[in-house]
Structures are given as C-alpha cells and as structure tokens.
C-alpha cells in the first residue's frame, strides 16, 4: 500500500502537513479497532492491522527524513538499514571537524555559549542540506537525494549528541 495514496496526497517530498494530520484523524476514527469490538474476529484483526498501517504511514510521512527515505524506496533506492558510507571527502572532513569541536566543548570557558554557537552552525548546515534534498527529490536526482539523507542522518545524530552533552553539563 502506498502511504501517499492512503492519505490522498500527491506523491512527493513536499506535502501539506495539515492535510496529512486531518486525514490521519479521519482514518483513525474510521478504522479504530474499538469500532469493530462486536464484529467477527477476522474483521477485528483486519481493523487492528489497518490501524497499524495507518500509524506507520503517518509516522513515515510526517517526518521529513523518513518521508524522503520512503519516497526514494518507491523509486527503487533503498536506504533503510544500509551500511553504505559517504564518498564525499569534504563532508567526511566536516564530520571530523564537528567531532573534534564537540570533544573540545568540555574545555570551553563558557560552554553554554559555545554549545549555542555550535548548535546554530549545525542547524544552519542542516537547513542547507534540507534545501538540497528538496531540490534533488523534485528534480529526480535520487543518488544526490540519497546522499543528502545520509548526511542529514549524521547531522541529526550530531545534534542529539550535542543535546546529551549539554544535559550532562547541567547534571554535574
């Protein structure tokens, strides 16, 4: 089942999130397992399965990276669970610099300010990568879009690590 079709959306990266949420609520109401409590067992099971599909579809489509991965999979490029590394030397160097900078935050005299500045820089790069991803998907440049997804996953993990580091500063 195509998630875009399930929600009555045009297949593409950019979508109307309000329409997605509204259709989700309608589908949840229509296929909620409680509505089938007095139905035969096979119908109850079908309702539970349909509700799970609706939830999976919504979770996938509402998150931009998951939506991009799903869209690429519909086009024949599977990214989930892959172990492929990036061949972009400049981005690999950027990763090393970011990792080094994250490690150096511990020695900063004003770690709160350093974290804020670092987060702002990473978010800016994230925004640029999202723009590149949007353009690549719109123009059918799937290999380029796949690379953007890989890079964005790294950036998201880095932001999570930065959050954990910041939390650890305030726990001490």
Swiss-Prot record:
Pfam families: HSCB_C (PF07743). It comes from the Bacteria. One of its GO terms (biological process) is protein folding. InterPro entries: DnaJ_domain (IPR001623), HscB (IPR004640), HscB_C_sf (IPR036386), HscB_oligo_C (IPR009073), J_dom_sf (IPR036869). Keywords: Chaperone. GO terms for molecular function: ATPase activator activity; protein-folding chaperone binding. GO terms for cellular component: iron-sulfur cluster transfer complex. Residues 2-74 form the J domain. HAMAP family: HscB. Interacts with HscA and stimulates its ATPase activity. PANTHER family: IRON-SULFUR CLUSTER CO-CHAPERONE PROTEIN HSCB. Belongs to the HscB family. Co-chaperone involved in the maturation of iron-sulfur cluster-containing proteins. Seems to help targeting proteins to be folded toward HscA. This is Co-chaperone protein HscB homolog. The gene is hscB.
């Amino acid at each position: 089942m195509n998630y875009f079709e399930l929600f009555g959306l045009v297949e593409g990266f950019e979508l109307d999130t309000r329409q997605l949420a509204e259709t989700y609520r309608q589908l949840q109401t229509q296929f909620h397992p409680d509505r089938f409590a007095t139905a035969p067992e096979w119908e109850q099971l079908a309702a539970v399965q349909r509700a799970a599909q609706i939830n999976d579809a919504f979770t996938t489509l509402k998150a931009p990276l998951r939506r991009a991965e799903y869209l690429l999979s519909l086009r024949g490029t599977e990214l989930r669970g892959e172990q492929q590394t990036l061949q972009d030397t400049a981005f690999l160097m950027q990763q090393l610099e970011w990792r080094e900078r994250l490690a150096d935050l511990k020695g900063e005299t004003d770690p709160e300010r350093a974290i804020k500045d670092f987060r702002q820089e990473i978010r800016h790069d994230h925004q640029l990568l999202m723009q590149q991803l949007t353009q690549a998907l719109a123009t059918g440049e799937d290999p380029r879009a796949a690379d953007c997804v890989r890079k964005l996953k790294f950036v998201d993990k880095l932001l999570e690590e930065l959050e954990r580091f910041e939390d650890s500063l305030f726990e001490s």
